[in-house]
């Protein structure tokens, strides 16, 4: 429905993945399938625009212009000196959400696009915060907020780290006009959840605020296997990955190539 945006997102989500791990993107490769070359022009334009914006070159890939329909796959290479993992959140940590609210929803999707029309230098500087925080030893674990939204991404972090998380819905900051329920499932173009030691919360939040990015502590990390949502005096169970795995991480030891 929006091939330019699909191409842009192919780059954007990959550079966000690298930032979420405390790294800096180096290069991108892509695979494009289309019925004909002209069918892929708008898609490729979106990729080129994002590549130029984030200054991450597309160095190669594969094209098939004899395919049944338009499809895209993108991979990214990056480097990090201090990793942010999904596996190191611990009981006692605080969950922080950092999101760029300077945007709007793209068409009828749940994609909150804060990169459209934004200065490229600002977007690159915002992403640079993640490796800087990691190299400063201020972030223990984290993930970029994906298509599963804030709650689903927090669930993935909890399961990866074998911890419980309770999210305070009243603490979640939202863009002007955004309702809570759709915001919880939204996929922001810049959004991260981070596990941070209590003593480091103020320092981490201030780094984002210095760049006019919304950031706040939204939850607590404890022992267990659940994700709870609370508002006021009410707390409800959202998911228990011990009884119903979300990612189904049966083994952290690779069993095949």
Label each region the model flagged.
Residues 195-202:
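Helix N-cap motif at beta-to-alpha junctions
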């Amino acid at each position: 429905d929006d091939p330019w945006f699909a191409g842009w997102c192919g780059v954007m989500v990959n550079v966000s993945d690298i930032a979420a791990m405390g790294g800096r993107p180096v290069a991108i490769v892509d695979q494009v399938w289309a019925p004909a070359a002209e069918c892929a022009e708008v898609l490729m334009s979106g990729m080129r625009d994002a590549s130029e914006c984030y200054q991450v070159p597309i160095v190669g890939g594969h094209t098939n212009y004899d395919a049944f329909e338009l499809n895209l796959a993108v991979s990214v290479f990056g480097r990090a000196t201090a990793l942010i993992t999904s596996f190191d959140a611990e009981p006692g940590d605080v969950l922080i959400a950092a999101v760029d609210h300077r945007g709007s929803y793209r068409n009828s999707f749940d994609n909150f696009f804060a990169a459209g029309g934004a200065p490229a230098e600002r977007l690159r500087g915002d992403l640079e915060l993640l490796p800087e925080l990691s190299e400063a030893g201020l972030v223990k674990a984290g993930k970029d907020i994906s298509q599963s939204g804030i709650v689903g991404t927090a669930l993935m972090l909890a399961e990866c780290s074998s911890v419980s998380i309770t999210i305070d819905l009243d603490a979640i900051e939202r863009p002007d006009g955004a309702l809570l329920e759709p915001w919880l499932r939204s996929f922001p173009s810049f959004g991260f959840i981070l596990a941070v030691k209590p003593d480091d919360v103020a320092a981490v939040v201030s780094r984002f605020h210095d760049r006019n990015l919304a950031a706040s502590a939204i939850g607590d990390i404890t022992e267990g296997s659940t994700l709870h949502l609370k508002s006021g005096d009410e707390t409800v169970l959202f998911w228990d990955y011990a009884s119903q795995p979300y990612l189904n991480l049966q083994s952290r030891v690779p069993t095949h190539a």
